[in-house]
Amino acid sequence: MGKYFGTDGFRGEAGITLTADHAYKVGRFLGWYYNALRERNGDNNPARIVIGKDTRRSSYMFEYSLVAGMTASGADAYLLHVTTTPSVAYIARVDDFDCGIMISASHNPYYDNGIKLIDCYGEKMPEETLLLVEDYIDGKLHVFDQDWPELPFARREHIGCTVDYVAGRNRYMGYLISLGIYSFKGVKVGLDCANGSSWNIAKSVFDALGADTYVINNQPNGLNINLNAGSTHIEGLQKFVVEKGLDIGFAYDGDADRCLCVDEKGNVVTGDHILYIYGCYMKERGKLLTNTVVTTVMSNFGLYKAFDEKDIGYAKTAVGDKYVYEYMAKNGCRIGGEQSGHIIFSKYASTGDGILTSLKMMEVMLAKKKPMSELAAPLKIYPQVLENVRVTDKKAAQNDEAVQAAVKNVAEALGDTGRILVRESGTEPVVRVMVEAPDHDTCQKYVSEVVDVIRDRGYSL
C-alpha cells in the first residue's frame, strides 16, 4: 500500500484527510497520463474516463473536482452519476474506457469518502500507476523516465468534454437482468439499500425479473448512507423480513460491492455461507473450475471443515477483495470472497458485486427449490472473538517474541478444534487478535491471553 491509496482506494474524512484539492490532482494527473499514453501509441483522440459516485453529500464535491482536473488536462469525463462500484468496473471494461473512478467510502459513515481507481479491464488500478498519482499529489512528477516541471493545461478545442452517461448505468442494469436465468415471480424479496448506491438500481433489477420487491433504506439524503442500515447494520433487515413474511432478504453497503443475506426465518447468511452455498452448487454441476473456492484468512474455521466434508478445495489470501481477485485471475478460479460479503463471480465480474451476489443466491434457491435456511444449514459457524488492540507500533507488536510465543501456545492448545489469527490493520494503528473455537468462553480466554501479553509488553495506546 502507498501513502494515500490502500486496498480500497484513497479514503478518509471528507475535507480533512481527503480534500477537493486531492481529487483535482487525481483527475489532473490521470487526464494527462492517459492522454500521453494514447499519443505515444499514435492515437490523438482524448482519453475517456468514466466516473461514478455514491450518495454522500461530499461525493458531488469530489466529482466536480475530479472532472475539473481531468478536463483541464484534456480528457473527457463520462458521468454515471449515483451508481455502484461494480457498475463502474463493468462499464470501464465493456465500453473501452481508459480507466474508471468510483467516489465512495463503501460502508463508512457519510462524513468519510474515498476515491477508487479502476483500470481499463475493470480491475483495481496497478500499484505502479497509483504510485505515480501519489507522487503528483506530493509535487513530484517523474513519468516515462523523465522529470516534468508541471503538467500542461489543455487549450481551446483540446479542453476535455463532460458527458452525461446515464446510458452506461442502464447498460449495467440490463446486464444484471440478463443474468437472471429464472423468473422471480411469486418470490417475496426484501432489499436494504443502505441509503446508498443501490437505492434505485437493485429494486429495478428485481422488479424486472418479476419479484415481489420490498425495500428499506432507499431514501438517501446525503447524510444517512449506512446510518443504522445496510450490511453493517443488518438487524433492521432481519426484523423487516420476519415482520413482512418475506422469502429472502439482501443487504448492501454504501457502494453495493458487498451483500449479506437474511433467510426467511430472520437469520443472517454471511459471506462465508454464500461461498459455501454457491461453491456446493457449482461442484454439484461440475462447474467449480480447479475445485477451489478462494477465501481470506478471516473466513470462519467452520467453512473449511464444511468444504473438507464436500471434498471442495480452498485457498486463503490476505484480507481484501483485491487479493482474492488476484488469486482467482492467476489460478482460474470461479468464485471467491470475504466473510463481510465481498463475493466475486469471475465469470461475470471483475470485482465484488452485491446485486449480482443476490441474483446468484436467488438462482440457487430456485434451481434447488429450497429456502435459504435449508441451503445454509449444513455450514456450522464456529464462535469467534475478535479484539482490536490500538498499539504504538503494529509491526513491532506483532513480531515481538513474547507475543509470538503466546500465539504459538494458543495454537497448540487449540489443535484442530479451532484457530488463532493475529494480524495488523491496513488502515489503523491496530493489531487484531481473533480466535475461533467450539465455544465462546474458550475464544475469549485465548484472545485475552494474547492481548494481555501485547499490553504487558508496552505496545498498547
Please state what every model-predicted region is.
Residues 43-54, 188-190, 291-297, 432-434:
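Short glycine-rich phosphate-binding loop at a beta-alpha junction
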Residues 36, 40, 48-112, 204-262:
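N-terminal small/polar loop signature for handling phosphorylated ligands or for N-terminal nucleophile
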Residues 1-68, 72-73, 162-186, 395-396:
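An N-terminal, well-structured beta->alpha segment
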Residues 13, 113-242:
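Gly/Ser/Thr-enriched, mixed-charge loops and adjacent short helices
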Residues 80, 131-173, 178, 264-337, ...:
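Proline/glycine-rich low-complexity loops and linkers
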Residues 5-6, 51, 77-82, 102-103, ...:
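General beta-strand structural signal in soluble alpha/beta enzymes
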Residues 248, 285-461:
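Phosphate-binding and adjacent anionic-ligand microenvironments
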